[in-house]
Amino acid sequence: MKIIILLGFLGATLSAPLIPQRLTSASNSNELLLNLNNGQLLPLQLQGPLNSWIPPFSGILQQQQQAQIPGLSQFSLSALDQFAGLLPNQIPFPGQASFAQGAQAGHVDPLQLQTPPQTQPGPSHVMPYVFSFKMPQEQGQMFQYYPVYMLLPWEQPQQTVPRSPQQTRQQQYEEQIPFYAQFGYIPQLAEPATSGGQQQLAFDPQLGTAPEIAVMSTGEEIPYLGKEAINFRHDSAGVFMPSTSPKPSTTNAFTSAVDQTITPELPEEKDKTDSLREP
């Protein structure tokens, strides 16, 4: 097993190239666009420790590359313009002709149709260094759609911000109405709708009783108030619900009916309790 592992390491080290070499790859397309090295592709150079073992393969590769090199090195500027239109990755160098005009003459990209022709830079304004190809298109779109993308997001919050507190106030008021109704209080906004006659029907001062179901002005029924109001005369004589209306007629009716029942009963009950407590 040790021998097999050693042979594997030796094969891996011998197969790896020890000298840096330049191969024809997709990166050479940038050199064609930039007119570097006179637009020539370098041939494949199989440099390594195993080159002496395979002489026929290297000769065949060199013959094929030598046959392809003269055709590749005779590209003209017009051919480079059309070829650059197919590969929109880089902006041309200053010495080259207009890139946008060559792309329109050859194959037109769908992204270029969106930008207006006025925003395309001319040959005199081409930058001397290479940078991303999509930047002029994005700049053209930003200038073209500047009021659409920048003004609409600022207009929408201005319309929605003043509406939000009004909706919340209405919701809070609707939530507060049952909160007051639970304790038997009538909100102040409901006072003009109610009259003194309706309140006298809800709590009869002469009998000291109330109907089984007390109906509020808002239309909500409170069943448990009726049971508590029926026992007002028996449990605690004289207890009554205070009215929130400013009319004095209802208060006088309550006090006149209550005072007649309180005066004869309270002294008798006190005498009975005192006589029972004394030994």
UniProtKB/Swiss-Prot annotation:
Q: Where is the signal peptide?
A: 1-15
| InterPro entries xref list | Odam
Compositional bias (Polar residues) = 243-263
Explain the post-translational modification: O-glycosylated.
Gene Ontology cellular-component annotations:
cytoplasm; extracellular region; nucleus
Region of interest: Interaction with ARHGEF5: 127-129
Give the highest taxon in the source lineage: Eukaryota
Subcellular location(s): the record lists: Secreted; Cytoplasm; Nucleus
Where does this chain mainly localize? secreted
| Segments of this protein annotated with the region Disordered | 243-279
Q: Bias category Basic and acidic residues: which stretches?
A: 267-279
Keywords linked to the UniProt accession: Biomineralization, Cytoplasm, Glycoprotein, Nucleus, Secreted, Signal
Pfam family name, one: ODAM
Q: Biological process (GO) annotations?
A: biomineral tissue development; odontogenesis of dentin-containing tooth
Subunit description: Interacts (via C-terminus) with ARHGEF5.
Q: What does the UniProt record say this protein does? A: Tooth-associated epithelia protein that probably plays a role in odontogenesis, the complex process that results in the initiation and generation of the tooth. May be incorporated in the enamel matrix at the end of mineralization process. Involved in the induction of RHOA activity via interaction with ARHGEF and expression of downstream factors such as ROCK. Plays a role in attachment of the junctional epithelium to the tooth surface.
Instruction: Identify this protein by name.
Output: Odontogenic ameloblast-associated protein
To which species is this protein native? Answer: Pan troglodytes
